[in-house]
A protein has these predicted regions:
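Transition-metal
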Residues: 1-135, 195-220, 242
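Ligand-binding loop in jelly-roll beta-barrel domains
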Residues: 79, 87-92, 100-101, 108-111, ...
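His/acidic/aromatic-lined binding-pocket segments of jelly-roll/cupin-type domains
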Residues: 84-85, 93, 114-117, 155-156, ...
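Short, structured patches in soluble enzyme cores that scaffold and shape functional sites
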Residues: 97-99, 119-122, 131-133, 144, ...
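Double-stranded beta-helix
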Residues: 128-151, 180-222, 302, 307-312
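Short acidic-glycine-tyrosine-enriched beta hairpin
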Residues: 153-165, 275-294
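C-terminal amphipathic alpha-helical segment
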Residues: 190-260
């Protein structure tokens, strides 16, 4: 197996901030609202580069050695099918929805199922996810017209270590004060149903997609709750599996076994670690190839935590 660090791709967003620098030492552009860092992505407009080799994720995916890098369970798709981001939401995001696979083509978009893992939250941080029990489509449309649609959403307070699974069709928004690791299908399709009547960087209201949103919203999706992890497993779905590995004692050791079935994306969410003899700080993202072997992991802090992503 081989371990590669990943070169992040920063995205300016009106709701972003500077927390990726403050928390993780990232070299983000100063005095700019950086809302997203694309950690692992294979899209025409953005392709992750592996620092040590200089190769892009797409070059590995398109190579004859795909199974060597991504494992025997890698699907036969034109692009690497998972997109992983860090989000710094210092203002609330739009109320939005992503299209289900059955509706995406007619909406001229790509389907997106995703999950959020909360890394840091302010005392007042919250999210909007799904509908309040009993909200109907006519009620939702009436609230849209009266600019009160946020009242239709189910609201949850957030805390570090919580996770929310968001299947396509679930209306949602991230509230202010959340720093999140997001794992999703490789899609950049978002339909905004409401954007709090604010303007974008150009002083104009950002585009809304009300008709597409209404077509895609699951109006039977009421009051979803945070994910309930089973042992190390946080979430698994048909697109990805996300695990959490906790180290509750200083200098605690552990092993991560690579079977050959799949790659690992590894994110250091708490503490610092020595992995196979090399030290890595909090906020580091690593790509670990699928060649069989065992990684020796040692926590270098009182408490440590790793998040890993691989195939389901």
């Amino acid at each position: 197996m081989a371990i590669f660090t990943l070169q992040p791709i920063f995205q300016q967003r009106i709701w972003g901030g500077q927390n990726l620098k403050t928390l993780f030492g990232r070299d983000v552009p100063p005095d700019q609202p950086i809302g997203e860092s694309w950690e692992l992505v294979d899209r025409p407009e953005a392709r992750t580069r592996l620092v040590e080799s200089g190769q892009t994720l797409h070059e590995l995916w398109a190579s004859a050695d795909r199974a060597k890098f991504f494992g025997t369970a890698a699907p036969d798709t034109p692009q690497f099918p998972i997109l992983i981001k860090l989000l710094d939401a210092q203002d609330k995001l739009s109320l939005q929805v992503h299209p289900p696979a059955a509706l995406a083509p007619q909406c001229n978009g790509d389907p997106k199922t995703e999950m959020w893992y909360f890394l840091e939250t302010s005392p007042s941080a919250k999210i909007y996810a799904g509908l309040k029990p009993g909200v109907t489509r006519p009620q939702f449309e009436h609230a849209l017209a009266s600019h009160t649609v946020a009242d239709c959403f189910h609201v949850l307070k957030t805390a570090p270590g919580e996770a929310m699974f968001l299947p396509s069709g679930r209306v949602h928004a991230i509230g202010a004060g959340n720093v999140i690791l997001e794992i999703q299908q490789n899609s950049d399709t978002t339909f905004r149903v409401y954007d709090w009547d604010r303007t974008g960087a150009d002083g104009q209201p950002r585009a809304l997609h009300v008709s597409e949103s209404l077509a895609c919203i699951n109006f039977d999706d009421f009051a979803p709750q945070f994910a309930q992890p089973h042992a190390d497993r946080i979430v698994t779905c048909q697109y990805f599996t996300v695990n959490r590995h906790r180290f509750d004692e200083p200098r605690q050791n552990g092993d991560l076994t690579i079977s050959g079935r799949g790659f690992y994306f590894l994110f250091i969410s708490q503490g610092a670690f020595t992995i196979s003899g090399k030290e890595y700080a909090r906020g580091t993202s690593l790509f670990i190839t699928a060649e069989p072997g065992t990684l020796t992991v040692e926590s270098r802090a009182d408490r440590g935590e790793l998040i890993t992503v691989t195939w389901p």
